[in-house]
From Swiss-Prot:
Gene Ontology annotations for the cellular component aspect, listed alphabetically: cytosol
Keyword Aminoacyl-tRNA synthetase annotated: no
This protein's encoding gene: rsmG
Annotated Gene3D superfamilies: Vaccinia Virus protein VP39
Taxonomic path: Bacteria, Pseudomonadati, Pseudomonadota, Gammaproteobacteria, Enterobacterales
InterPro entries linked: rRNA_ssu_MeTfrase_G, SAM-dependent_MTases_sf
Function as written in the Swiss-Prot or TrEMBL entry: Specifically methylates the N7 position of guanine in position 527 of 16S rRNA.
Keyword field contains Ligase: no
Residues the record lists as binding S-adenosyl-L-methionine: 73, 78, 124-125, 139
Localization, UniProt: Cytoplasm
Protein name: Ribosomal RNA small subunit methyltransferase G
CDD domains: AdoMet_MTases
Family label: Belongs to the methyltransferase superfamily. RNA methyltransferase RsmG family.
Amino acid sequence: MYKQLDTLLAQAGISLTDQQKQRLLGYVSLLDKWNKAYNLTSVREPRDMLVRHIMDSIVVSPYLQGLRFIDVGTGPGLPGIPLAIVRPDANFTLLDSLGKRVRFLRQVQHELRLDNIEPVQSRVEAFVAEPPFDGVISRAFASLQDMVSWCHHLPAAHHGRFYALKGGVPQDELQSLPAGVSVDQLIRLQVPMLEGERHLVVLKSD
């Protein structure tokens, strides 16, 4: 799979160290192993995980501004763990309410020696951000309206951003954003070998 990952990274124009590549593959291996017992993802094949989980996550990396991020509704660590591997300079809090997922995240943290992630079991509304985060990230977590409503207390007041990974452009969601929140960027993502559109919606508080 190393060769497949190399090919995908080259197609995406992403340059990583050998250690980063090995950690990404190690994460896929752990996800595949735990998935058999814990049903963490509907994607069953490791080769598909490379495209639909790893590449789909790390193409967001160039657009993240800041050093402290929280991945809300992270599930098995997506996109937080792949992003933490490719952004060792930044810290990622991985938030999920389900114990089995958080146990998996802690195992990944231990086995891959990732010191820039912090798995936390909590509902997003109950989590206290001290200090607030540079960015709040979500992938298949909620509508933009719900994301802003549930996570409004998490980003830093002036420079904090919401980063939502979406498929097609969510026009209905964009038109129903709550007052005081606007679109900062709408970025079409290029994910090698992935069918369908992918977009990153970046929101800011006015």
